[in-house]
Amino acid sequence: RDEVAVRNCPRVYPVKPIENLVRARQTLLAEPGPSPWRLVVLGGGPAGTEIAANLWRLCAEAGIPRDITLVAGERLLAGAPPRVRALALESLRSRNIHVLEATRARRIEPGEIVLETGRILDYDLAFSAVGVRPSPLFEESGLPTGPDGGLLVDSTLRCTAHREIFGGGDCISLRGTTLARVGVMAV
C-alpha cells in the first residue's frame, strides 16, 4: 500500500485510531460548514468503503449537504469476490458517492488532494484509510513481530515468545503466512 505525502493538513483524518473519526464527526456536526461539504475518502479497501458509507449516513441523518468522493486506488475492494465488489459499487453509487478507480492520491495539501492522474480534488474534510498496519506497540514493547510489525503468533494465535499472550485480527503476523489487512483492529 502506498503512503501519501501529507503537508500540515489538520482537516485530514487518518481512520486510526478511532478517536480521529470521533473528532471528525464532531467537526462535521458542530460547524455550519460549506454547502455542500466536500468529503474525500482515500483508500478503496473495506475501511475506506465503510467510512464513505458511514459519512453518507451521518450527513443524511443530520441533514448536511455533502459531496462524497472515494479514491479507491486500482479498484474498489480489490481483494473481494467480484459479486461483493459489484454490490458495494452499486450501493455507493446509488447514494451519489463518487468512486474513483485506477488512481491514488499523490499529495495532500490543505484543501486539495492531487491525484496520480493530475486531477485535483478540493476537500473540506478528508479521511485516510490507506496502508493499514499494526500498531507499533508490539515492537516498542520488545515482543516478537513479523515483517509488517504485527505480533508474531503461531497457529493457535499465541505469541511465539510469551505463551500467555494471544493476538488476533489486523494486529498479528501469523508465522509462515501472509495475512490480508482488512481494516479491523483487534487485540
Task: Give the location of each predicted region.
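A conserved beta-strand/loop capping segment in the N-terminal third of enzymes
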Residues: 1-7
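FAD-site-proximal beta/loop scaffold in flavoenzymes
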Residues: 10-35, 120-187
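Loop/helix-junction capping segments adjacent to catalytic residues or to phosphate/diphosphate-binding pockets
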Residues: 22, 49, 78-79, 162
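Rossmann-like NAD(P)H-binding beta-loop-alpha module
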Residues: 24-65, 71
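Short, glycine/serine-rich, charged loops/turns that create anion-binding
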Residues: 46, 75, 172
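A Rossmann-like FAD-binding core segment of flavoenzymes
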Residues: 57-155
